[in-house]
């Protein structure tokens, strides 16, 4: 019994997460290559390993031979083939493992900086965190443990490339699954998410259980759950929006804390005209337009923010223009407004 071979196979299988059968096959192939190198390509050579005892048998033209007589050059050939085959098996194992984890969060330690990108030690391999997938303003030091989303896994020839992300919207989604059990258990559903990494995220949630407050559960007792997520993101602001099937209600919720006076929906153009008082205008639009931009992405509507004066002027201009057309009366104009056509621009865009 070849206990030493069995021990080596067992050790490689554990360390590299490779099936033992694959390793036995690799050794048989390496011995076959060595035998062909020693005896010549024309010879009929067969190599087998007993999986229970570890005993090796090499046959040449049906005759049992001693593989230890192959010589140094043949042994070197066997070594090279074995190393190559085990590397291929390990690459396949890593590819399979991380392909299954694509879209999930993984924890690793920063190994080194490669220009503006980071190499992250994931145990059996390294992940690549490019600058474009980092949160703006964040810095990390070597040895620091960080959490990332497994964004992409691909075989690039001699190694597996694992692209990581901390700026992708799904990173937020997975963090909520980790921090909020009701999200993990699918009692609370993340219906939509819009993110500008490092600055602000809006996440719309709903609950299938009327006894569970979706917003309160995500915030946690005294804000404990949302604080953990914000801390992980380096202070990025997160607005938790209560989902509603009504577009008007959802848009209103997404623009909070701004107070909405009126919303007009134009379904043909996918445009929502939101009216707010002058005092609420900057709050609704947000810094550099961020609040309304994220609300638009969250709800799927192109949102225009107007003051009551601007809204009234648009309606007045529309009415004056329509009055010049023969046969147009108040009822027709009211129908246009009900369809979300509230100014001349809307009228032109719908092709009137």
Model-derived segments and spans:
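RNA-contacting regions in translation and RNA-metabolism proteins
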Residues: 1-352
């Amino acid at each position: 019994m070849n206990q030493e071979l069995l021990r080596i196979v067992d050790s490689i299988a554990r360390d590299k997460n490779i099936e033992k059968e694959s390793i036995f096959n690799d050794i048989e192939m390496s011995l076959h290559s060595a035998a062909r190198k020693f005896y010549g390509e024309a010879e009929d050579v067969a190599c087998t390993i007993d999986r229970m005892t570890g005993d090796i048998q090499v046959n040449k033209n049906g005759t049992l031979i001693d593989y230890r007589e192959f010589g140094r050059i043949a042994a070197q050939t066997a070594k090279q083939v074995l190393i190559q085959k085990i590397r291929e098996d390990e690459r396949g194992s890593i590819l399979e493992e991380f392909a299954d984890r694509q879209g999930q969060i993984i924890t690793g330690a920063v190994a080194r900086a490669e220009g503006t990108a980071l190499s992250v030690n994931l145990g059996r391999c390294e992940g690549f965190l490019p600058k474009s997938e980092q949160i703006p303003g964040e810095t990390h030091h070597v040895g620091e443990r960080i959490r990332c989303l497994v964004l992409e896994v691909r075989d690039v020839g001699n190694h597996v490339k694992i692209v990581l992300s901390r700026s992708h919207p799904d990173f937020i989604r997975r963090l909520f699954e980790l921090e909020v059990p009701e999200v993990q258990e699918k009692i609370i559903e993340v219906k939509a998410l819009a993110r500008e990494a490092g600055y602000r995220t809006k996440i719309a949630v709903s609950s299938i259980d009327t006894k569970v407050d979706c917003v309160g559960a995500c915030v946690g007792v005294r804000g404990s759950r949302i604080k953990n997520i914000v801390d992980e993101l380096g202070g990025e602001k997160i607005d938790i929006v209560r989902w509603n099937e009504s577009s008007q209600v959802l848009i209103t919720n997404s623009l909070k804390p701004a107070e909405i006076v009126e919303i007009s929906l134009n379904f043909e153009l996918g445009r929502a005209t939101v009216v707010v008082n002058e005092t609420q205008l900057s709050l609704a639009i947000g810094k550099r337009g961020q609040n309304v931009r994220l609300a638009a992405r969250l709800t799927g509507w192109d949102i225009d923010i107007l003051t009551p004066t601007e809204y009234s002027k648009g309606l007045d201009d529309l009415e004056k223009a329509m009055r010049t057309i023969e046969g147009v009366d108040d009822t027709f104009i009211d129908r246009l407004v009900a369809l979300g056509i509230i100014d001349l621009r809307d009228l032109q865009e719908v092709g009137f």
